Amino acid sequence: MRNLEKINELLEIFGHFDVNFAKTMEEKIDTQYFVLENLKNSMNNDEMFIKLVILNSIVSYQLCTTGELWWEEFSKYWSKHDANNENLGESYVNFLENSKGNKRLLNVKIKRIERITPFLENLNLLDFKTYYSDMEKLLENLSKYLNSKKNSKTVVFAVKMFGYASRIVFNEFFPYPMNIEIPKDSRIEKYTLKFTDENPIKFWNEVSKTAKIPPLHIDSIIWPVLGRNFDFKSCENKLDENFRYLLKLTEL
């Protein structure tokens, strides 16, 4: 059942946003972007940086902590440890097995790492630059190697984080494609219930088309502010007049 009044309010709010606002949210507000910037600056290997980001993305579910803290743990660890193509999978599995924030379903997650590592080992920085301009192709290949649907949470999330990592490495912004759907995690599912009990992916696809903002960028707008430790005061000066509309998202 749909709450049409709330949906109309949501669409009115998103009428004030665009892709550039989502980019601002990503680069100035999303702590996951910050920790990737810190990690990139502490590593001397951009190719390995992107590969590690993809590996971490495909096991970022059923966490024992928040997504923000999990990515902070990832960044801190790999700023002090090395990996290369010969030991990429083994090195990452060692990190995963000893992590604090990701202890559930380890056997399943390790199998995912084993499936995707051969694909990543054969890629170089030029390949990643090509994928950055064709993220739907990356989605297709990740889906194939992981034997997962293209709209599965970790596959689309991996593309999102790959986009972050590539933006940082190549210092260039490519918007996410309209055809790549929102990662359906617990925050998004819970928030969607304010508007409808239908499939969150279907609902946010409709919002995306109306607002003319790709679903992964919509995720960047709503996901951070739904976090339980989100500090609105710290971001007010970074978002000018759009701050009040962002605040309204939490009041619906």
UniProtKB/Swiss-Prot annotation:
What SUPFAM superfamilies has UniProt attached to this entry? DNA-glycosylase (SSF48150)
Pfam families found in the cross-reference section? AGOG
- GO biological process, alphabetically ordered: base-excision repair
UniProt-listed Enzyme Commission number(s):
3.2.2.-, 4.2.99.18
* Active-site residues, Swiss-Prot/TrEMBL: 153 (schiff-base intermediate with dna), 185
Q: Which InterPro entries match?
A: AGOG (IPR016544), AGOG-like (IPR015254), DNA_glycosylase (IPR011257)
Gene Ontology molecular function terms on file: class I DNA-(apurinic or apyrimidinic site) endonuclease activity; oxidized base lesion DNA N-glycosylase activity
Q: Which domain of life is it from?
A: Archaea
**Keyword vocabulary terms for this entry:** DNA damage, DNA excision, DNA repair, Hydrolase, Lyase
Write out the ranges of the annotated region (Helix-hairpin-helix).
Answer: 129-193
Instruction: Show the catalytic activity.
Output: 2'-deoxyribonucleotide-(2'-deoxyribose 5'-phosphate)-2'-deoxyribonucleotide-DNA = a 3'-end 2'-deoxyribonucleotide-(2,3-dehydro-2,3-deoxyribose 5'-phosphate)-DNA + a 5'-end 5'-phospho-2'-deoxyribonucleoside-DNA + H(+)
Binding residues for 8-oxoguanine: 32, 60, 71, 157, 183, 219, 223
Described by its record, this protein's role is as follows:
DNA repair enzyme that is part of the base excision repair (BER) pathway; protects from oxidative damage by removing the major product of DNA oxidation, 8-oxoguanine (GO), from single- and double-stranded DNA substrates.
Q: Which family does it belong to?
A: Belongs to the archaeal N-glycosylase/DNA lyase (AGOG) family.
Q: What is this protein called?
A: N-glycosylase/DNA lyase
